[in-house]
Amino acid sequence: IRDSYYIPDSILLIGSADKTEYWKDANALEIVNTVVERMNAAGYTRTDDKDTANLGLQLSYVQKVTYFVGYDYPYWWWYYPYYWTPGYWGDWAGWHYPYSVYYGYTAGSLLVEMMNLEADQESGKKLPVIWDSFIGGLLTSSEELNQQRTVDAVQQAFDQSPYLKK
């Protein structure tokens, strides 16, 4: 399907444990569904088959302060086991930016990343991120307010990116 995308029904948790964990409750699904609604409204079609999708979307929630070293290092994911598993999308070794980038994400941050799944699939190639959104400052003492702020911020990320429309 042309202009199709794949998105999991869960949110990757970063900094929560020494193993990969996912956020899968009703709140997580509301956030995922907000992204789905906005992608569909922009003219894309969701597919359950990541092998036929043109784009992949990953949502990640930072539970504690996290620092990523440089994306230019070819095996950076070895230093942060909570992030992408290298074979998730296929033969790609992982995604990267074409230059050295250093980030410090604070607790309560949501990352939304769109990957080009039609990139060169030769073994060892990087999966390119073609759009991303960093949403910080989501934590308050109210879980209900945190959830509403997160959903509103996802809406705002798409509002600020009108070029995503087909």
What do the PLM-derived regions correspond to, one by one?
Residues 59-120:
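Surface-exposed short loop/turn segments
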Residues 4-8, 56-60, 111-113, 131-134:
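Soluble periplasmic/extracytoplasmic beta-strand elements of cell-envelope proteins
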Residues 102-130, 135-166:
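C-terminal/domain-edge helix-coil "capping" segments
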Residues 1-30:
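A structural "domain/chain start" motif
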Residues 12-14, 62-66, 118-119, 136-140:
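Solvent-exposed loop/turn segments at secondary-structure junctions
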Residues 2, 39, 52-56, 105-109, ...:
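Extracytoplasmic
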Residues 36-45, 62-65, 158-163:
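Sec-exported extracytoplasmic/periplasmic mature domains
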Residues 43-53:
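Short acidic low-complexity segments
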